[in-house]
Amino acid sequence: MTTALKVKTSSLPGSRLALEVGVPADRCKASYEAAVERLSRSVRLPGFRKGRVPKPVLLQQIGPLRVKASALEDLVDSVLRDAVEQEKVEVLGQPSLSGNFEELLEKFDPAKELVVTLEMDVAPTPTLKSTKGLSAEAESVAYDPARVDELLDQSRRQLATLVPVSDRAAAMGDVAVVSFSGVFSDDKSAIEGGSANGLDVELEEGRMISGFVEGVVGMKPGDKKDVDCQFPDDYPEETCRGRKALFSISLDELKGRELPELDDAFAQQASDKKTLSELREDLENRLKQDAEQRQKNNRHEALLKALVDQLEVELPESLIKEEINSLLQETAAQMAQQGMDVKKLFTPETVQNLAQASRGEATERLQRSLALKALAKAEGISVADKDLEAKIKEVSAGFSDTNKIDPQRLRDAVAEDLLRETLLSWLEENAKLTMVDPASEDKPAKASKAKSSKAKAEKEPAAEGQAKAKPAAKTSKSKTKAAEKLITPID
């Protein structure tokens, strides 16, 4: 049985802990002798069989410093493991020596006790200054009936038939078939890939770099025109960022949109509904649900912010880095789902920039999670087993093949969601939540304590009524890949 180590613990800033460990001389000696034995088995010397090199010869050939270094490496690893286990420390990340290895090696004498100081990140202990009586303001979200007509119009545009136009000038909403070439205004150098023949351009605000669409509007088929444009500062192609350009544009063809009639036939084409009235009703329900969900999200955001304001915690760096990595993995997964080549896009420089940009979001996510954890502990809030089992059963019913689901991971995820729901519902009942009209924030609505049946803050759902909408007919002609890259629509 290993003799208990003499350990002194001291807290460090940033949720770190220092362990000063006194290593007995006999353990130092044992580690040194084990290193000699290990090296004698692995070192090959002329005149000696492998594993039979005498200790004096070994020390003479490879040097006592190498033996001591090998012994100290193993000693530090074993001491760290035993000290953490003995003191029951929840370590995050990789512990490190206080000071450098070379300094410790100079002090290491196998015949004497050695003091090793180790530093490590530890799980933070979040506390809340207050849990009840919190005040928060959230923007109300109202259902807007006008959005029904807007969505119907969007769907009609998507299903529109493109017809040639020759008797008028190009207008916003048309599709222009253009040929163009561009040069930079400052040095008149050609823009790499900044040319195309027969490129379809939707004449909509923000679809192209500034000035391009505006320049085409007013042209008639057969017209040629020089148009001043401006590349945005955040343009993907670095050589173009912020620069002015001159494009010589010819309007080869103009197409107008012939919208379908707003009737039952349109409803059947645009969705799975049989009549226009059914489609309108479906859109109304979707938009109402969307407004309710967004208002609920606003309430939860406001309550979480108020709760985080009460949080007292120091975040260890290793935990922040872990959360950043999680965010980067989510980003990579989303890009992969969109068909992007993640390996090609995620260069070391890109990953570094994304990591730096994600630090704020990672910190905020950790603070929210720890604030909810502290609330659960302070108020003794938990999820009942029967509720957990019922929810797991409900979620499992939505899977086509439950054999592919890890039961423990599913249980953990459902338990986390249910606890979050319970905690946010508790906050709504115990906080003063004022709903504010976003159109006139100086006239706050009456304070409310509306209860919530589901607490996980979900992403705002898109209120798209044009289910199964069909794309407009494509009639694009030849175009260069470079032009697609440089003159890409800017969303």
UniProtKB/Swiss-Prot annotation:
<keyword id="KW-0697">Rotamase</keyword>
<dbReference type="InterPro" id="IPR008880">
    <property type="entry name" value="Trigger_fac_C"/>
</dbReference>
<keyword id="KW-0132">Cell division</keyword>
<comment type="similarity">
    <text>Belongs to the FKBP-type PPIase family. Tig subfamily.</text>
</comment>
<dbReference type="InterPro" id="IPR037041">
    <property type="entry name" value="Trigger_fac_C_sf"/>
</dbReference>
<dbReference type="GO" id="GO:0044183">
    <property type="term" value="F:protein folding chaperone"/>
</dbReference>
<dbReference type="InterPro" id="IPR046357">
    <property type="entry name" value="PPIase_dom_sf"/>
</dbReference>
<dbReference type="GO" id="GO:0003755">
    <property type="term" value="F:peptidyl-prolyl cis-trans isomerase activity"/>
</dbReference>
<dbReference type="InterPro" id="IPR008881">
    <property type="entry name" value="Trigger_fac_ribosome-bd_bac"/>
</dbReference>
<dbReference type="GO" id="GO:0051301">
    <property type="term" value="P:cell division"/>
</dbReference>
<feature type="region of interest" description="Disordered">
    <location>
        <begin position="435"/>
        <end position="491"/>
    </location>
</feature>
<keyword id="KW-0131">Cell cycle</keyword>
<dbReference type="GO" id="GO:0043335">
    <property type="term" value="P:protein unfolding"/>
</dbReference>
<protein>
    <recommendedName>
        <fullName>Trigger factor</fullName>
        <ecNumber>5.2.1.8</ecNumber>
    </recommendedName>
</protein>
<dbReference type="InterPro" id="IPR005215">
    <property type="entry name" value="Trig_fac"/>
</dbReference>
<feature type="domain" description="PPIase FKBP-type">
    <location>
        <begin position="173"/>
        <end position="260"/>
    </location>
</feature>
<dbReference type="InterPro" id="IPR036611">
    <property type="entry name" value="Trigger_fac_ribosome-bd_sf"/>
</dbReference>
<keyword id="KW-0143">Chaperone</keyword>
<dbReference type="InterPro" id="IPR027304">
    <property type="entry name" value="Trigger_fact/SurA_dom_sf"/>
</dbReference>
<dbReference type="GO" id="GO:0043022">
    <property type="term" value="F:ribosome binding"/>
</dbReference>
<comment type="function">
    <text>Involved in protein export. Acts as a chaperone by maintaining the newly synthesized protein in an open conformation. Functions as a peptidyl-prolyl cis-trans isomerase.</text>
</comment>
<dbReference type="GO" id="GO:0005737">
    <property type="term" value="C:cytoplasm"/>
</dbReference>
<keyword id="KW-0963">Cytoplasm</keyword>
<dbReference type="GO" id="GO:0061077">
    <property type="term" value="P:chaperone-mediated protein folding"/>
</dbReference>
<dbReference type="Pfam" id="PF00254">
    <property type="entry name" value="FKBP_C"/>
</dbReference>
<feature type="compositionally biased region" description="Low complexity">
    <location>
        <begin position="463"/>
        <end position="475"/>
    </location>
</feature>
<dbReference type="GO" id="GO:0015031">
    <property type="term" value="P:protein transport"/>
</dbReference>
<dbReference type="GO" id="GO:0051083">
    <property type="term" value="P:'de novo' cotranslational protein folding"/>
</dbReference>
<dbReference type="Pfam" id="PF05697">
    <property type="entry name" value="Trigger_N"/>
</dbReference>
<dbReference type="InterPro" id="IPR001179">
    <property type="entry name" value="PPIase_FKBP_dom"/>
</dbReference>
<keyword id="KW-0413">Isomerase</keyword>
<dbReference type="Pfam" id="PF05698">
    <property type="entry name" value="Trigger_C"/>
</dbReference>
